[in-house]
Amino acid sequence: MVLSAADKNNVKGIFTKIAGHAEEYGAETLERMFITYPPTKTYFPHFDLSHGSAQIKGHGKKVVAALIEAANHIDDIAGTLSKLSDLHAHKLRVDPVNFKLLGQCFLVVVAIHHPAALTPEVHASLDKFLCAVGTVLTAKYR
């Protein structure tokens, strides 16, 4: 998926609002995903999946930090997320569909916290960006 210059600007703009909330938004995203899509819990059998758990907050922070890093290097998402792609494909063996589910939940969290900023154009750009991230994270499954 090709991101236009406008898409890149929209993504960078929304991530400036997200950057200070990585743990909070990440935890909300994971909790929403686990509730909405219960099979995604199978990858976290050792986690305390209760609301507000330190493990959910910690992993959520890592997830959003990776998205921030990808947004900061939007012209080289593949290079930026290469090690993460290897980890998920070869060691963790996460079902690729879960990246799409996570992206949908992240969009909802962004919409809840920044409704005015998530214009239709920004929404479309962020969705394209999350699809690009998902494509990169699943590229090494092939």
From Swiss-Prot:
Q: Which residues form the Globin domain?
A: 2-142
| Tissue/organ expression | Red blood cells.
| Amino acids binding heme b | 88
Q: Which UniProt keywords apply?
A: Heme, Iron, Metal-binding, Oxygen transport, Transport
| One GO BP | hydrogen peroxide catabolic process
Superkingdom classification of source: Eukaryota
Give the binding site residues for O2.
59
| Gene3D superfamilies named in the record | Globins
Q: Which GO molecular function annotations are given, in alphabetical order?
A: haptoglobin binding; heme binding; iron ion binding; organic acid binding; oxygen binding; oxygen carrier activity; peroxidase activity
One GO cellular-component annotation of the UniProt record comes to:
blood microparticle
What Pfam families does this protein's entry cite?
Answer: Globin
What does the protein in this record do? Answer: Involved in oxygen transport from the lung to the various peripheral tissues.
Q: How does it assemble?
A: Heterotetramer of two alpha chains and two beta chains.
Q: Family, per the entry?
A: Belongs to the globin family.
What's the name of the protein?
Hemoglobin subunit alpha-A
Source organism of the structure: Meleagris gallopavo
High-level lineage: Eukaryota, Metazoa, Chordata, Craniata, Vertebrata
* Gene name for this UniProt entry: HBAA
